[in-house]
C-alpha cells in the first residue's frame, strides 16, 4: 500500500478516536524484546500526536520471576496470579517501579513524548483490598499480598493526560491502611479503563489473540461477546494466565468500555494496525457486532 493510501485509510479512524482515551496494557513478556518495545513506544506517541490520549499500564511478570530466581526464591502461581509474600512484594516493587516503569518513561522521552511514571499509591490512584484465599482443589490457598481493586481515583490521570503527558502505571496498589498490594496488571488496566470511561482497552501480549485451539496459533477467534467468556473457559479454550487477561477485558466491556482488544505485540506497530487500518488483528471483545 502506498504511503498516501495508508494516511487516507487512517483518516476516518483518527476522526472517530480524536480526544478519546485508550488504556493500553503491555505485558512483561513483550517488554523483554527491545525492538518490540521501541515499536510500542513509537505507536503510543503517535496516538498522542493525533489527539488520542493513551494511558499505559504495564506488567512485569517475567522480570520479577527472573529477579526472584537470581535471589534464590521460587515463583509460585495460582490461577495465573502470583503468590506474594512480603519478600516477593518488595522484589515486585523494585522491578516494577525502579526498573520497568522508569525504562518506559525514559523511552517515551527518547522518542519525543512526555511520559510520567505512576504507581497505584500516587494520589490514591488504585485502592485495593487483600484478595481472599482461593479455593484450589478443595483447599483454601492464601495468595499473600495480592490485592483486588476496590476503587480507582482517576483525577491524577486526567490532569496529566490533559497536560500532554502519557501516564505509565505500575500495578502496585494501596489499601485503606496504607499498605502496598500487588495487583494483576490486566485487572488494573480494566479497572482504569472503566474509571476513565475509555473508548478502548487494548492488551498487548505475546500471542496472536484468543485461539480457537490453544495449541494452534493459526486459528484465532476474531471476536466474541462477554456472555461467551465462561463457556470458553469451561471448554479449555481460555486457560492459565490468559484467564485474568481475558476476564479483565470482559469485565471492562460489561461495565461500559466500548471494545477490548487482545493483540500480538510481536507484530511491528500492532497498535497502529489495530486502531488506524481496516485490517485489524487479534481478538476483539464487544457487545457490538
UniProtKB/Swiss-Prot annotation:
Lineage: Archaea, Methanobacteriati, Methanobacteriota, Stenosarchaea group, Methanomicrobia
Pfam family, one: AA_kinase
Biochemical pathway: Amino-acid biosynthesis; L-arginine biosynthesis; N(2)-acetyl-L-ornithine from L-glutamate: step 2/4
Database matches in PANTHER family: N-ACETYLGLUTAMATE SYNTHASE (PTHR23342), N-ACETYLGLUTAMATE SYNTHASE, MITOCHONDRIAL (PTHR23342:SF0)
Full protein name: Acetylglutamate kinase
Chain positions of site Transition state stabilizer: 25, 245
One GO BP annotation of this record: arginine biosynthetic process via ornithine
Positions of disulphide bridges: none
Enzyme Commission no: 2.7.2.8
UniProtKB keywords: Amino-acid biosynthesis, Arginine biosynthesis, ATP-binding, Cytoplasm, Kinase, Nucleotide-binding, Transferase
Localization annotation: Cytoplasm
Reactions mediated catalytically: N-acetyl-L-glutamate + ATP = N-acetyl-L-glutamyl 5-phosphate + ADP
Source species: Methanothrix thermoacetophila (strain DSM 6194 / JCM 14653 / NBRC 101360 / PT)
GO cellular component: cytoplasm
Molecular function (Gene Ontology), one example: acetylglutamate kinase activity
UniProt keyword annotation of Nucleotide-binding present: yes
CDD domains membership: AAK_NAGK-C
Major location (coarse): cytoplasm
Family statement drawn from the similarity comment of this UniProt entry: Belongs to the acetylglutamate kinase family. ArgB subfamily.
Stated role: Catalyzes the ATP-dependent phosphorylation of N-acetyl-L-glutamate.
Residues that, per the record, bind substrate: 60-61, 82, 182
Gene: argB
Amino acid at each position: 500500500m502506498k504511503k498516501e493510501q495508508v494516511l487516507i485509510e487512517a483518516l476516518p479512524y483518527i476522526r472517530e478516536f480524536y480526544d478519546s482515551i485508550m488504556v493500553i496494557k503491555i505485558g512483561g513478556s513483550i517488554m523483554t524484546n527491545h525492538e518490540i518495545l521501541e515499536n510500542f513506544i513509537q505507536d503510543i506517541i503517535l496516538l498522542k500526536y493525533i489527539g488520542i490520549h493513551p494511558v499505559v499500564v504495564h506488567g512485569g511478570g517475567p522480570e520479577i520471576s527472573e529477579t526472584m530466581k537470581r535471589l534464590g526464591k521460587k515463583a509460585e502461581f495460582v490461577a495465573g496470579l502470583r503468590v506474594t509474600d512480603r519478600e516477593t512484594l518488595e522484589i515486585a516493587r523494585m522491578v516494577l517501579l525502579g526498573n520497568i516503569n522508569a525504562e518506559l518513561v525514559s523511552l517515551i522521552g527518547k522518542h519525543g513524548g512526555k511520559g510520567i511514571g505512576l504507581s497505584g499509591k500516587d494520589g490514591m490512584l488504585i485502592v485495593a483490598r487483600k484478595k481472599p484465599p482461593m479455593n484450589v482443589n478443595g483447599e483454601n490457598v492464601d495468595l499473600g499480598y495480592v490485592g483486588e481493586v476496590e476503587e480507582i481515583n482517576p483525577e491524577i490521570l486526567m490532569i496529566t493526560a490533559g497536560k500532554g503527558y502519557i501516564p505509565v502505571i505500575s500495578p502496585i496498589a494501596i489499601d485503606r491502611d496504607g499498605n502496598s498490594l500487588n495487583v494483576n496488571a490486566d485487572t488494573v488496566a480494566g479497572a482504569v479503563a472503566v474509571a476513565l470511561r475509555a473508548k478502548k482497552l487494548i492488551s498487548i501480549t505475546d500471542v496472536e489473540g484468543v485461539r480457537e485451539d490453544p495449541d494452534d496459533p493459526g486459528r484465532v477467534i476474531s471476536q466474541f461477546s462477554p456472555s461467551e467468556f465462561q463457556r470458553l473457559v469451561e471448554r479449555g479454550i481460555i486457560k492459565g494466565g490468559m484467564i485474568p487477561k481475558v476476564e479483565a477485558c470482559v469485565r471492562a466491556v460489561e461495565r461500559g468500555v466500548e471494545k477490548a482488544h487482545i493483540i500480538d505485540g510481536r507484530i511491528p506497530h500492532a497498535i497502529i494496525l489495530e486502531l488506524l487500518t481496516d485490517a485489524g488483528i487479534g481478538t476483539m471483545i464487544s457487545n457490538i457486532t
